[in-house]
Amino acid sequence: MEFEIALAKEQSYLDIIPKKASEEIGRVLAELTISPEELRQGTLLNGVPILPLLELVKEKLSTESKTYLHFGATSQDAMDTAMVLMLREALGVINERLTTLEDNLSQLREKYGDTPCMARTRGQLAVPISFGDKIDAWLEPLKRHEKRLTTISKGALKIQLGGAAGNRAAYHEKGETLSDALASALKLSSGSSWHAQRDSLCELTNWLAIISSILGKMGADILVLAQSEINEVTENAEGGGKSSAMPHKNNPILSEALVALAKLNAGLQSQMLLCLIHTNERDATAWILEWSCVPQMLINTATSLGHAIAISKKVKVNTDNMRLNVERFKNQG
């Protein structure tokens, strides 16, 4: 609806549609009450929710204004732009959590970074390192990818306005100008339409998968360090992760979730790569894959960051055991 309001307004500024029609379209859309059931039935019939939504709007428009609703645009223009607007909002949450986690890990490093502990390579004791070295393996990749998000977001958070076949033919020589104006109104990047060019979106979801995998590595490390016979880290110093059969346990449940969510996002990203095989000028089979993958990957990444933040706040670093394990290793020689 935000897309349709902005589209009509910018079209009127460029004299593509009458100002009176634009104002009526904007007013009706702003006041529209949507029936989820009507939208559901229309989506089942047509494959996308845009047609039933437009029908609901047209019922309240004058005969003249109906002609100018959604003028020159296609359902994918509205759907993709709506997805991008929601992506922007979700990425705001994710970036905020990422910054919080980096701050927490930096504080953890400042407090425990000089503590000696054992490196473990290929599942075996290697040589002594510091706990700061281990934290760096979690923190530094997060910092690198926070910087990369700015560039990746610019490519992915882009207006979609291609019309029937992606070339904006309905707008004649005003197509590019309209796209730029619409992008500016919605505070998105502009450029050519990307109906069948999904690489920027796939690059963004790959970023989500990488963030999840970095956190999965953090979770996997903690799962080893929290093992009873090692006991260098307790995931939650306040308790939790209880067992119904073994009350003595304090299971590292959030670290387990980090590993599981990393694997889920890795699998979903493999499906996103298939969306690049977007046949000809539009391909709903690829589109439907995105509808399933993108929201879930956002949820998985935000959840992973939330779990990692909780760990960084509540983790207990058992420095005595770290030093003890180092001394045991030295005494083996």
At which residue positions do the language-model features occur?
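Glycine-rich cofactor/substrate-binding loops
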Residues: 1-3, 13, 23, 41-46, ...
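A helix-coil-helix interface module used to build multimeric assemblies
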Residues: 1-168, 174-181, 241-243, 253-257
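Generic, well-ordered alpha-helical scaffold segments in large soluble proteins
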Residues: 6, 10, 56, 60, ...
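A structural signal for small-residue-enriched, beta-sheet-centric alpha/beta enzyme cores
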Residues: 75, 167, 172, 185, ...
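Alpha-helix capping and helix-loop boundary segments enriched in small/acidic/polar residues
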Residues: 78, 118, 122, 126-133, ...
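Short amphipathic alpha-helical segments with heptad-repeat character
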Residues: 88-95, 99, 106, 136-139, ...
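Conserved helix-loop functional segments at active or binding sites
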Residues: 111-114, 148-151, 155, 184, ...
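Acidic, glycine-rich loop-and-beta core segments that form the ion-binding/anion-interacting portion
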Residues: 177-266
